[in-house]
A protein has these predicted regions:
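Membrane-proximal intracellular helices of multi-pass ion channels
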Residues: 1-181
């Protein structure tokens, strides 16, 4: 038990260091990089600004946050297995399969809804950008945002809110940082 705890701690420290470096390389100030590395990896979702990640208006920062949220919401027992070189176990894990299936379905549905709603001027890439971030944040129960909450409730309406709500309810798995199930 002591050995396993130590390994998970080292993995977490390593992910944190890499996350800080990636946020910094994406253009985030160092202090903010440290803060968001911790909050995205732990899927805590705390933000330093009211606008959350949207404050930076930076697609690279959003991409880093997406990757870090997914890593943080992945079963940490699998991290060790993957780092030992056993990638097959990652793809065999039922929680991982379900999470990726929900993620892809959610992204597809929200992207189509946003594109068809003309809220983003029928801009497909912008619709994908916002849907991927919000869907990942909802499914991992992180709560970081690239779209203000009032904009989601007032403009996204219907299907977008429904999909995000379902994903938040389903949330992360038992061995994730979120410990929802």
């Amino acid at each position: 038990m002591k050995f396993t705890t130590r390994i998970i701690l080292y993995i977490y420290i390593g992910y944190t260091a890499v996350s800080i470096a990636l946020f910094k390389m994406a253009g985030m100030p160092l202090f903010d990089s440290v803060f968001y590395a911790f909050t995205a990896l732990s899927t805590g979702g705390f933000a330093m600004q009211n606008a959350s990640i949207a404050f930076y208006h930076n697609a690279w920062i959003e991409l880093v946050a997406i990757i870090v949220m997914i890593i943080g919401a992945t079963n940490f027992a699998l991290h060790y297995t993957v780092l030992k070189g056993n990638w097959k176990e990652y793809f065999k894990d039922i929680e991982t399969k379900v999470a990726w299936t929900l993620l892809l379905i959610g992204i597809f549905l929200v992207t189509i809804f946003l594109y068809n709603s003309s809220y983003y001027g029928h801009n497909f890439l912008l619709s994908i950008r916002y849907s991927v971030f919000q869907v990942v944040s909802a499914l991992t129960t992180t709560g970081l945002q690239t779209v203000p909450g009032n904009e989601i409730t007032l403009q996204w309406e219907g299907m977008g809110i429904f999909v995000l709500t379902i994903l938040m309810i389903v949330g992360a798995g038992a061995c994730y940082n979120s410990n929802i199930l």
